[in-house]
């Protein structure tokens, strides 16, 4: 139900970013819309006359007579249904009226009257309260400029309200997504990824919604017949001028809606890129853990093989080795060699498997550059026994803090220094 508040606006109208509109409303009287219960036999709407005054608040009309008086069909009323089911945005031009269905606004615009249908949603009711105030002010305004047609002023008020809602929602989503993306740059957390998924779904819904509105406005701009028919009260000889005025009006809000589409699409692309990078990092960490587990398993197997022979010799059975002078040394040497041999052979097999994996990840027919890159990755992740010995000796002799550089790296560093000096 619609009530007139004679003092300041209800604070609930200032929710979800309508602070700018509410600041205007706080200076004078405002509307407060309550959601209604749908009825299959009647339509409930608020009526504005040609002077912008409210002549009916939540007034109920029988559906059949409402359609018959305006030359509409039952299928036209489905687009203006007050149910919570969202319909594709549309502006349908009829001989005697214009049917508007944009987001939370469902209205019928005639040449001297506007019918704004009530809603069943509390959130949409708050937004309709802002529309009522703007619509009353716009329809009742009189200026020294050339008079704008009544139906065009009503349509402009509706488009302004729709674009304001889109702008508010996009700013909210952009802020939330930006915070999550900045946090993911510092640390990858499961809760942050869940928040990013939720915000991504909301942003995708906003993108689809704004895209449908933009395409609808584009279709209207492409149809000269609809532009001419949107002038419900044309003066003689001014049809072309009125059509041009409507075209300029729709084109202005088309560009604004297209801006929201482009910005939301760019933000969605950034989210997708971030998700791809996060997946790559998680895959790399998973592969590192698997490689570490394989290395631990190989070392454990080598240690087990090395202790197998001493375990046999340590049984309380006569084997005559304890009487030999070389028994202890021989068993120790054979065990160490067996353990190293098993470890080296397993690392060689792991290196071959890793080489095939890296080579296949580059391309079906890898070139010399890919082969060199694969070899570098193998030397870093799965070094050979000789490379391990060299690394251990270098660490013992020079210390771990000394970086290892070959001649090519030294020449490259000197080249960088000379280039910087010449600049």
Curated annotation (Swiss-Prot):
Gene Ontology annotations for the cellular component aspect, listed alphabetically: mitochondrial inner membrane
Bilayer disposition of the protein: Multi-pass membrane protein
Domain of life of the organism encoding this protein: Eukaryota
Keywords: Ion transport, Magnesium, Membrane, Mitochondrion, Mitochondrion inner membrane, Transit peptide, Transmembrane, Transmembrane helix, Transport
Motif CGMN mapped to chain: 313-316
Keyword Ion transport set for record: yes
Transit peptide (residue range): 1-25
Ranges that cross the membrane: 289-309, 324-344
Record's subcellular location: Mitochondrion inner membrane
Molecular function via GO: cardiolipin binding; magnesium ion transmembrane transporter activity
Chief localization: mitochondrion
Gene3D superfamilies: 2.40.128.330, Magnesium transport protein CorA, transmembrane region (1.20.58.340)
Pfam families per the UniProt record, alphabetical: MRS2-like
Residues of the signal peptide: none
Record note on quaternary structure: Homopentamer. Forms homooligomers. Interacts with MFM1.
Family, similarity comment: Belongs to the CorA metal ion transporter (MIT) (TC 1.A.35) family.
Function of the protein: High-conductance magnesium-selective channel that mediates the influx of magnesium into the mitochondrial matrix. Essential for the splicing of mRNA group II introns in mitochondria by affecting mitochondrial magnesium concentrations, which are critical for group II intron splicing. It also suppresses a variety of mitochondrial intron mutations and its absence may disturb the assembly of mitochondrial membrane complexes.
Protein name: Mitochondrial inner membrane magnesium transporter MRS2
Primary gene name: MRS2
């Amino acid at each position: 139900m619609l009530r007139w508040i004679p003092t300041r606006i209800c604070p609930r109208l200032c929710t979800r970013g309508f602070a700018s509109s509410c600041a205007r409303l706080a200076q004078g009287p405002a509307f407060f819309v309550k959601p209604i219960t749908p009825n299959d036999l009647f339509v409930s709407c608020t009526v504005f006359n040609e002077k912008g005054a409210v002549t009916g608040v939540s007034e109920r009309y029988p559906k059949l007579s409402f359609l018959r008086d305006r030359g509409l069909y039952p299928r036209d009323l489905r687009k203006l249904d007050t149910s919570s089911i969202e319909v594709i945005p549309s502006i349908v031009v009829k001989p005697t009226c214009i049917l508007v269905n944009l987001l939370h606004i469902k209205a019928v615009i005639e040449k001297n009257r506007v019918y704004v249908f009530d809603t069943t949603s509390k959130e949409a009711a708050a937004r309709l309260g802002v529309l009522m105030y703007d619509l009353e002010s716009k329809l009742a305004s009189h200026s020294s400029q050339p008079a704008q047609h009544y139906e065009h002023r009503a349509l402009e008020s509706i488009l302004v309200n729709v674009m304001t809602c889109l702008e508010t929602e996009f700013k909210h989503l952009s802020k939330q997504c930006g915070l999550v993306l900045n946090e993911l740059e510092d640390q990858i957390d499961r809760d942050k990824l869940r928040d990013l998924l939720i915000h991504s779904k909301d942003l995708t819904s906003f993108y689809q919604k704004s895209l449908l509105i933009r395409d609808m406005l584009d279709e209207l701009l492409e149809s000269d017949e609809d532009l001419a028919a949107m002038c419900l009260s044309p003066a003689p000889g001014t049809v072309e001028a009125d059509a041009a005025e409507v075209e300029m009006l729709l084109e202005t809000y088309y560009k604004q809606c297209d801006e929201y589409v482009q910005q939301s699409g760019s933000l969605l692309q950034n989210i997708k890129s971030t998700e791809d990078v996060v997946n790559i990092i998680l895959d790399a960490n998973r592969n590192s853990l698997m490689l570490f587990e394989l290395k631990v398993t190989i070392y454990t197997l080598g240690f087990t093989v090395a202790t197998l022979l001493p375990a046999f010799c340590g049984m309380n059975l006569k084997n005559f080795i304890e009487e030999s002078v070389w028994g202890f040394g021989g068993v120790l040497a054979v065990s160490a060699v067996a353990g190293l041999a098993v470890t080296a052979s397993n690392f060689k097999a792991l290196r071959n498997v890793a080489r095939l994996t890296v080579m296949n990840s580059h391309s079906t027919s890898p070139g010399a550059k890919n082969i060199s890159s694969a070899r570098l990755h193998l030397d870093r992740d799965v070094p050979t026994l000789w490379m391990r010995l060299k690394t251990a000796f270098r660490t013992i002799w020079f210390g771990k803090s000394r970086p290892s550089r070959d001649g090519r790296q030294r020449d490259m560093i000197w080249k960088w220094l000379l280039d910087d000096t010449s600049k």
